[in-house]
Amino acid sequence: MARPMGKLPSNTRKCAQCAMAEALLEIAGQTINQKDLGRSGRMTRTDNDTWDLASSVGATATMIATARALASRAENPLINDPFAEPLVRAVGIDLFTRLASGELRLEDIGDHATGGRWMIDNIAIRTKFYDDFFGDATTAGIRQVVILAAGLDTRAYRLPWPPGTVVYEIDQPAVIKFKTRALANLNAEPNAERHAVAVDLRNDWPTALKNAGFDPARPTAFSAEGLLSYLPPQGQDRLLDAITALSAPDSRLATQSPLVLDLAEEDEKKMRMKSAAEAWRERGFDLDLTELIYFDQRNDVADYLAGSGWQVTTSTGKELFAAQGLPPFEDDHITRFADRRYISAVLK
């Protein structure tokens, strides 16, 4: 049985920045409107909650963009997202604007420097994994791309897509509208034919996608970056089933498998997230991720896809770090989180 959620132990309080790192890994860009917050400031997930990019959970997409801005400015960066910082500024959340611009350092939020370095490296690794996935897919001849829960993803604008590539971005209407307008204000032009599909993934998004021009007879590269932890177990299965139903042979899918935690690990993770929430609250940003993530036991993503006819390849975060020559980390919590599997699959 998990211990009660009481006062945070001192070692947990000291690692607020590690908690921020963990929190960033869980965020997929999904957001829920401020109007759904109760008087306590906590979020209660409902079947019809909505989201934008400027309030409450909407800020999670901005948090990931902030991390990409930091990773892009790192010494010898693995990624380059020139739109990350200006998009963060456009959203206007003070904490993230100051972090993205360099005015505020991660060390100013928490006192665990290793956690901050790992967070930046991890977001770089994660971003590069999906960038490389799309590069490999187009090299194999795929010219139809679907980015699920796109948030502030700018791959349609920053990746060198081959001629004839069509990119479909799916997210909430407010998210799609904001990003499209903000990038237009930056005079940014997509490098592929971009179609923004404004639909909730809990609704009939396959029909909306096809109505936008998607051709299920063509091989497609799908991405579900950081998304699955924000879906209940049955929602995860429905999403994967829908992707399979839309996929022609040789289609590809990239995603991440949520960590399987025992009760003690789950309780510890929640406490660390609350520690991060306390640190953020001191900076004027109020968000408790424990109210957003589904910790329920669920089907193993790799096994589920394999059972649906996909040929699955997995890599752990540790393996991706090693492949880039990045140093390992000794913090137990970070090491555990680096066990998360990155999944690339091809439908046969």
Curated annotation (Swiss-Prot):
Protein name: Putative S-adenosyl-L-methionine-dependent methyltransferase Mb3432
Stored InterPro entries: Ppm1/Ppm2/Tcmp, SAM-dependent_MTases_sf, SAM_mthyl_Trfase_ML2640-like
Protein's organism: Mycobacterium bovis (strain ATCC BAA-935 / AF2122/97)
UniProt keywords, alphabetically: Methyltransferase, S-adenosyl-L-methionine, Transferase
MF-aspect GO terms: methyltransferase activity
A Pfam family of this chain: LCM
The keyword Kinase appears for this protein: no
Top-rank EC class of the record's enzyme: transferase
EC number(s) from the headed UniProt entry: 2.1.1.-
Positions of S-adenosyl-L-methionine binding: D171, D200, L201
Gene3D superfamilies for this protein: Vaccinia Virus protein VP39 (3.40.50.150)
Purpose: Exhibits S-adenosyl-L-methionine-dependent methyltransferase activity.
GO biological process: methylation
